[in-house]
Amino acid sequence: MIMNKMKNFKRRFSLSVPRTETIEESLAEFTEQFNQLHNRRNENLQLGPLGRDPPQECSTFSPTDSGEEPGQLSPGVQFQRRQNQRRFSMEDVSKRLSLPMDIRLPQEFLQKLQMESPDLPKPLSRMSRRASLSDIGFGKLETYVKLDKLGEGTYATVFKGRSKLTENLVALKEIRLEHEEGAPCTAIREVSLLKNLKHANIVTLHDLIHTDRSLTLVFEYLDSDLKQYLDHCGNLMSMHNVKIFMFQLLRGLAYCHHRKILHRDLKPQNLLINERGELKLADFGLARAKSVPTKTYSNEVVTLWYRPPDVLLGSTEYSTPIDMWGVGCIHYEMATGRPLFPGSTVKEELHLIFRLLGTPTEETWPGVTAFSEFRTYSFPCYLPQPLINHAPRLDTDGIHLLSSLLLYESKSRMSAEAALSHSYFRSLGERVHQLEDTASIFSLKEIQLQKDPGYRGLAFQQPGRGKNRRQSIF
């Protein structure tokens, strides 16, 4: 009966008559019918919603009539009571009537019906969510199959693995737990930061497995890293590819810096690359959230070759510019095929920097003489050399970008966000600046890698050949 009335009502809606009168009259009639049915159902008449007979086990009765306590009601009775208490929203009624999206029930009818939106289902608690994921297989070591050993360090071993859930390859970073010390602080940092970073140019943390003996981080698997890529192409990259990798590096770093996160350990070994050419920041073990009150950090960060001079001289107060110096060093290395400042000690590293960029003075670097290490070493007075003489394959824009990153005064270094808008990347087009955070640069058909001049026949080193990759992941 109710379905017939609904059809009649919908048919009246479709008539070509003045809209306001038709809506109000039809709704008035429907409202009255709806209220009657709703009241009759609440009076325990055996009539289900929209004219359907209710299931026998769901018949309604008072708890006191059955002699049961309210807390002892059967599931069927509890279900029916919940149904009696339900209120319908405007959206519910509109869906039942299949009204067009541009038609809304007038407010006065909603008030008359006292229709309130039903409570939305509450989100799962953290404990419930963990239990649900555990049922699927997440958080369990047996979900993953270890394949090849990729590397081993003081605290961790990295394996190539496979997920039984998805059949996808993964990287398993197994961190050994010492009962006296617990999980290393680097592992805690890496987990706490990566679980909140969702970007196409940042490695994805898929799962976390905690046992008595180990903490295993499950990452997406990428075939190679930038160091291995350079080795395989004979340290002679296409300048177009240099630009694409550089843009991806800056894109991922800008995302981190916008969230006040410093990577602090940028180097080619920590920039992973898959077969598609997607570059992703990895190894956040030394990363730091800068939102903490203090500005003092350890200066024992960043591999020596990519460490900025202010940190080499002992500065512990730094911000996002610490990463930008490393970006400049990596840019140079991709363009030339050799590291920019390959020093073996802090003093030698500073000597190489000063010999290329000129020995700093109070005029070129205010406050440099305040560093005791600078006064102690007594460096010769070098004059700056033109960068184009050392990186001749870079064009004018590339040299300008490089020089904007390799500045002594940290606050003067170009930021990652500003670097993305540099004219050096103009040839990539405008659409690369409009991508969503999780969208790959290669989702644009105009972005493709070119064959490198030093190409050796395979894009990446095959598993099992040469040294294990990602030695720097520790």
Swiss-Prot record:
Per its UniProt entry, what is the enzyme's top EC class, as one word? Answer: transferase
Protein kinase domain residues are: 144-425
- GO BP annotation list: positive regulation of myelination; regulation of cell cycle phase transition
Any single GO molecular-function term of the entry would be: protein serine kinase activity
Expression tissues? Isoform 2 expression is limited to several subcortical nuclei of the basal gangli and the spinal cord. Isoform 1 is widely expressed.
Q: At what positions is Phosphoserine found?
A: S14, S74, S89, S98, S117, S132, S440, S443
Q: Where is this region: Disordered?
A: 44-93
Which catalysed reactions does the entry list for this protein?
A: L-seryl-[protein] + ATP = O-phospho-L-seryl-[protein] + ADP + H(+); L-threonyl-[protein] + ATP = O-phospho-L-threonyl-[protein] + ADP + H(+)
Q: Which residues bind ATP?
A: L150, G151, E152, G153, T154, Y155, A156, T157, V158, K173
Identify the keywords attached in UniProt to this record, alphabetized.
Answer: ATP-binding, Kinase, Nucleotide-binding, Phosphoprotein, Serine/threonine-protein kinase, Transferase
Q: Name the Enzyme Commission number(s) assigned to this protein.
A: 2.7.11.22
Instruction: Cite a GO CC annotation.
Output: cytoplasm
- Write out the catalytic residues in the record: D265 (proton acceptor)
Q: What InterPro entries does the record tag this protein with? A: CDK, Kinase-like_dom_sf, Prot_kinase_dom, Protein_kinase_ATP_BS, Ser/Thr_kinase_AS
Coiled-coil region(s): none
Taxonomic superkingdom: Eukaryota
Q: Which family does it belong to?
A: Belongs to the protein kinase superfamily. CMGC Ser/Thr protein kinase family. CDC2/CDKX subfamily.
PANTHER family for this protein: CELL DIVISION PROTEIN KINASE (PTHR24056), CYCLIN-DEPENDENT KINASE 18 (PTHR24056:SF52)
Role summary: May play a role in signal transduction cascades in terminally differentiated cells.
Could you tell me what this protein is called? Cyclin-dependent kinase 18
